[in-house]
Amino acid sequence: MKLHELKNVKGAVHRKKRVGCGEGGGHGKTSGRGGKGQTARSGSSIRPGFEGGQMPLYRKLPHRGFNQYNFRTELPVVNVGDLASLDASITEVTAEVLAAQGLIRAGETSVKILGDGELSRALKVTAVKFSESAKAKIEKAGGQAITA
């Protein structure tokens, strides 16, 4: 299954809400915006964390420390079981081969191999990272796990 093959589940798509078209439609007069005030006006959006002008919580509390979360690199992952489902003619597996087979996005140059599933044939797999179980399964099947 690929992204362009997805279909909506029955009942997931609703008719659009026609607001301001008379009281009989159920969304007339205030168009579902409640009474008067800032949030009833057009263009109104209050930024997250705004508390009406009082000193917000995120400014009351001290900020300490630093982490690398924003600078992490997320690698696309492929399981050993997915490698087993590749064409029989493929003996060397790289990121380009996986992209051509639709297992990772086109243009991805690095990949991590994880150990879910079984592998029955010898493959020469080149990847940036391997889990320990994936490396063991590839080598047990007679293949090579090469870290790029």
Swiss-Prot record:
One term under GO cellular component: cytosolic large ribosomal subunit
Span list, region Disordered: 14-54
Pfam family, one: Ribosomal_L27A
InterPro entries: Ribosomal_uL15, Ribosomal_uL15/eL18, Ribosomal_uL15/eL18_sf, Ribosomal_uL15_bac-type, Ribosomal_uL15_CS
Compositional bias annotation for Gly residues: 21-37
Alphabetical keyword list: Ribonucleoprotein, Ribosomal protein, RNA-binding, rRNA-binding
PROSITE patterns: RIBOSOMAL_L15
GO molecular function: rRNA binding; structural constituent of ribosome
GO biological process: translation
UniProt xrefs under Gene3D superfamilies: 3.100.10.10
Origin: domain of life: Bacteria
Function: Binds to the 23S rRNA.
Assembly mode: Part of the 50S ribosomal subunit.
UniProt similarity note: Belongs to the universal ribosomal protein uL15 family.
UniProt name for this protein: Large ribosomal subunit protein uL15
Organism: Opitutus terrae (strain DSM 11246 / JCM 15787 / PB90-1)
Gene name for this UniProt entry: rplO
